[in-house]
């Protein structure tokens, strides 16, 4: 049986859907979310800019999505896949209505991407194994722009322009194998191996 819902709020909306793919064997769950703050602030900025000496521009919004799929091979063997993606965007700047004024613009976009997979297997009544793998990524991009009219002694003037970009990212890859062994009700042994790779740029 499929289930879903949609929620609409003042600043954001979200939706969710879940249900079976193969009856009694696999299922899925997907959810999304998105803000619309920029749709609310845009009319306000338009009204303010009509009476101001500078035209302000800016806003913020984000979205994200989650998805997961489960699959049961047997009563002793299960696997899953999961995924997440999210992004944020921010902007702030102003344009002067005077030709001799100053314009500036600042933009920042950042987000995450995460993917993982796992397999759980009951080897026997005393030994349980779990194998997982995952990938994560974070990215950030900043843009700064500025231009201005600079007067000079000859009164001709010059236009000064500057633009800068800054990018950064972090990525991780993770692999893990773990075992849970219970020889009897009074003893428990856990063992395994883990690999983690970091990349910065």
Regions found by a protein language model. Give the residues of each.
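Face-selective signature of the C-terminal outer-membrane beta-barrel domain
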Residues: 70-88, 109-201
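Short, surface-exposed linear patches
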Residues: 12-15, 27-32, 50-56, 94, ...
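Sequence/structural signature of outer-membrane beta-barrel proteins
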Residues: 13, 37-39, 51, 88-90, ...
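Well-ordered, non-transmembrane segments within structured domains
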Residues: 1, 5-16, 22-24, 29-30, ...
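Flexible, solvent-exposed coil segments and beta strand-coil junctions
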Residues: 1, 40-52, 91-101, 110, ...
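Predominantly transmembrane beta-strands of Gram-negative outer membrane beta-barrel pores used
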Residues: 1-72, 80-84
């Amino acid at each position: 049986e499929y289930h879903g819902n949609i929620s609409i709020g003042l600043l954001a909306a979200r939706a969710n859907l879940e249900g079976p793919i193969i009856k009694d064997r696999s299922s899925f769950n997907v959810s999304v979310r998105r803000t619309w703050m920029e749709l609310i602030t845009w009319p306000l900025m338009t009204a303010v800019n009509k009476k101001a000496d500078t035209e302000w521009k800016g806003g913020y919004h984000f979205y994200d999505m989650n998805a997961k799929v489960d699959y049961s091979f047997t009563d002793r063997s299960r696997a899953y896949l999961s995924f997440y993606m999210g992004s944020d965007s921010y902007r702030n700047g102003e344009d002067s209505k005077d030709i001799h004024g100053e314009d500036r613009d600042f933009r920042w976009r950042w987000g995450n991407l995460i993917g993982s997979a796992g397999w759980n297997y009951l080897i026997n009544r005393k030994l349980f194994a779990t194998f997982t793998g995952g990938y994560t990524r974070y990215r950030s991009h900043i843009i700064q722009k500025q231009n201005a009219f600079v007067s000079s002694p000859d009164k001709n003037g010059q236009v000064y322009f500057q633009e800068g970009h800054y990018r950064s990212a972090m990525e991780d890859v993770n692999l893990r194998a773990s075992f849970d062994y219970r020889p009897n009700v009074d003893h428990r042994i856990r063992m395994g191996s883990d690999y983690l790779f970091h990349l910065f740029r």
